[in-house]
Amino acid sequence: VADDRERFLGPTTIRFCPLCGGSLRRASVPPDHREQAVCRLCDFVFYLNPKVVAGTIPEQDGRVLLTRRSINPGHGLWTFPGGFVDFGESVTDAAVRETLEETGLTVDLTGLLNVYSYPGSPVIIVYRARVTGGTLTPCAENDLLEWRAPAEIPWATLAFDSTREALREWVAARGLTPGG
């Protein structure tokens, strides 16, 4: 999967400078001399940085809300509410917004669970959340929403490594042994 991301989103697929439209070349850039995309005309360095994803683990009565994805990546697999942080938006605002969009529920963030980072992937920031209102409603990105007790988490059908790691931490924080 990381190889596919590199092919479609990697530095070799960016060909033109966003400032002047000049063609980009690969060049060593100080101070660490890592190879980057550099404009042949204006010398602008185009750093391809990871995107940021904000997610929540909504909790209620000792259970966690999981969403089954109806789109790729991870079609048919389970995760928690989350999505990309929009430009100009804080990570916490994005976490609350994504939860509302994907579940119909409003939440208060109760703390940072953890930050997950994998080469070639977005940085995923996951918060614990308490439901404060709304009506449980799936969206176009998921076809099923379910409250699950720790023993009911479908470890074999989780969508992403970050989903698995975050849920393991959530379960372990309750003094239980995580599955999967």
Residue ranges of model-derived segments:
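A broadly conserved sequence feature marking short terminus-proximal activation segments
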Residues: 1-14, 166-176, 180
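Active-site-adjacent beta-strand/loop module that shapes the phosphate/pyrophosphate-binding cleft
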Residues: 115-137, 146, 150, 166, ...
